[in-house]
Swiss-Prot record:
(6S)-5-formyl-5,6,7,8-tetrahydrofolate binds at residues 21, 78, 118, 452. Exhibits a very high intrinsic GTPase hydrolysis rate. Involved in the addition of a carboxymethylaminomethyl (cmnm) group at the wobble position (U34) of certain tRNAs, forming tRNA-cmnm(5)s(2)U34. The gene is mnmE. Its EC number is 3.6.-.-. K(+) binds at residues 224, 243, 245, 248. Coiled coil: none annotated. Keywords: Cytoplasm, GTP-binding, Hydrolase, Magnesium, Metal-binding, Nucleotide-binding, Potassium, tRNA processing. It comes from Haemophilus influenzae (strain PittGG). InterPro entries: G_TrmE (IPR031168), GTP-bd (IPR006073), GTP-bd_TrmE_N (IPR018948), GTPase_MnmE (IPR004520), MnmE_dom2 (IPR027368), MnmE_helical (IPR025867), P-loop_NTPase (IPR027417), Small_GTP-bd (IPR005225). It comes from the Bacteria. The keyword Cell membrane does not apply. This is tRNA modification GTPase MnmE.
Length: 452
């Protein structure tokens, strides 16, 4: 028999309204015990909520949803009372006294809904993402995921892969046919079409991941290059202390900002040099740790100092020490001191922006550059949020499609192509939960609120 669970569905603490949710086959029994009757399905009823001895604990609205026409797909009872935590705790305690009722685990209501096919795994995750959204665009994209925008794209890919698998396996099972299916070009054309289709979804998912998680951008450079001034300019407030004394910043400073809905984690670090002071050395060590973990580096140069902007020295002192895959944007700061105009250019393979963090001249250029560098498009229609596990699954699917293409075009190996397509289907299906381990489900739903 399925279990019946209960939890507070509203946030803990004081509020105008507090809601308890009961889900499972004993929901009607809870209604009889607390309300003296079970409300008609989907009809609000204003009733007293009673303790075991008949004492009225609260009064409010009771709603009953009969399976399968509920959020979880089970019988659901919602008690909407006053939002005092003491009152809600008393009512919750009373419900838990009823045999067969237990407190819900975090995310268990959503887990019930997923297991009852009310939505798929990507949609379930979108519930948590909608709650946690930190910007209007992130909230809109989470809602699109909840409505199935992401799942629809993934399911279309899965359908295309299944169709191609069927065609490939037919060519293997019927080798005596006069037509060589592997060589007639149709399979290769379909395979390349799926690869292109997947690339479009990956690009959109990458933007969705940016919206959800943000990008970590570290500002680095020599002391007194204007790193803290740039942090303040991007943050729009005096987040960091700025002086003419080199080495003022000795620890890591973090600011969370939004650029047209794109979340950025901006990190100001200690100036990089050979320090003799122990505290400054610790700060520089922490700076390098942040640099190694960054998604992008903003390398600050002092344009008023000819030695500072010598790219050959910059390359040996700094750029050569970075991971080769780490993207770098070079910023020539302090153009207000030499009369330069704000500009954007490319030098030696690096994007370079000339600006003044002091006067903010050119800061807008940097903001636009960061948006473009992250692959972010303002106001993108049909966007959805994506998690790291979604990107990983899409990346693995893309990798096996490319392997399959090689097996087809270079080795004419139908059996190996069929196996690669099977793996692609498996990775894509992990996103929506069609093929998902119990451990993964546990990790996902345990991150939800208790009442979700």
């Amino acid at each position: 028999m399925k279990e019946t669970i209960v939890a507070q569905a509203t946030a803990p603490g004081r509020g105008g309204i507090g809601i308890l949710r009961v889900s499972g086959p004993l929901a009607t029994e809870v209604a009889q015990a607390i309300l003296g009757k079970c409300p008609k399905p989907r009809m609000a009823d204003y009733l007293p909520f009673k303790d075991a001895d008949g004492t009225i604990l609260d009064q409010g609205i009771a709603l009953y949803f009969k399976s399968p026409n509920s959020f979880t797909g089970e019988d659901v009872l919602e008690l909407q009372g006053h939002g005092g935590q003491v009152v809600l705790d008393l009512l919750l305690k009373r419900i838990l006294q009823i045999d067969g009722i237990r407190l819900a685990r975090p995310g268990e209501f959503s887990e019930q809904a997923f297991l009852n096919d009310k939505f798929d795994l990507a949609q379930a995750e979108a519930i948590a993402d909608l709650i946690d959204a930190t910007s209007e665009q992130a909230a809109r994209s989470a809602l699109k995921s909840l409505q199935g925008e992401f799942s629809k794209k993934v399911n279309e890919l899965v359908d295309s892969v299944i169709y191609l698998r069927t065609y490939v396996e037919a060519s293997i099972d019927f080798p005596d046919e006069e037509i060589d299916f592997l060589a007639d070009g149709k399979i290769e054309a379909n395979l390349r079409s799926i690869i292109n289709q997947l690339e479009d979804v990956r690009a959109e998912a990458k933007q969705g991941s940016i919206l959800r998680e943000g990008m970590k951008v570290v500002i680095a450079g020599r002391p007194n290059a204007g790193k803290s001034s740039l942090l303040n300019a991007l943050a729009g407030r005096e987040a960091a202390i700025v002086t003419d004394i080199a080495g003022t910043t000795r620890d890591v400073l973090r600011e969370h900002i939004h650029i047209d809905g794109m979340p950025l984690h901006i990190i100001d670090t200690a100036g990089l040099r050979d320090a003799t002071d122990e505290v400054e050395r610790i700060g520089i060590s922490r700076a390098w740790t942040e640099i190694e973990q960054a998604d992008r580096i903003i390398l600050m140069l002092d344009s008023s100092d000819p030695e500072s902007v010598d790219l050959s020295k910059v390359r040996s002192e700094f750029l050569a020490k970075l991971p080769s895959t780490l993207p770098v944007t070079i910023v020539r700061n302090k153009i207000d001191l030499n009369g330069e105009q704000a500009s954007e250019s490319e030098q030696s393979g690096y994007q370079m922006i000339s600006l003044s963090a002091q006067t903010h001249d050119g800061v807008k250029l940097l903001r636009e550059h960061l948006k473009q560098a992250m692959g972010f498009q303002t106001g993108m229609e049909g966007g959805f949020l994506a998690r790291r596990r979604h990107l990983d699954a899409l990346d693995k699917a893309a990798e096996h499609l490319q392997i399959g293409l090689v097996q087809l075009t270079e080795f004419h190996a139908g059996e190996l192509l069929a196996e690669e397509l099977r793996l692609v289907q498996s990775y894509l299906s992990e996103i929506t939960g069609q093929f998902t381990s119990d451990d993964l489900l546990g990790n996902i739903f345990s991150s939800f609120c208790i009442g979700k």
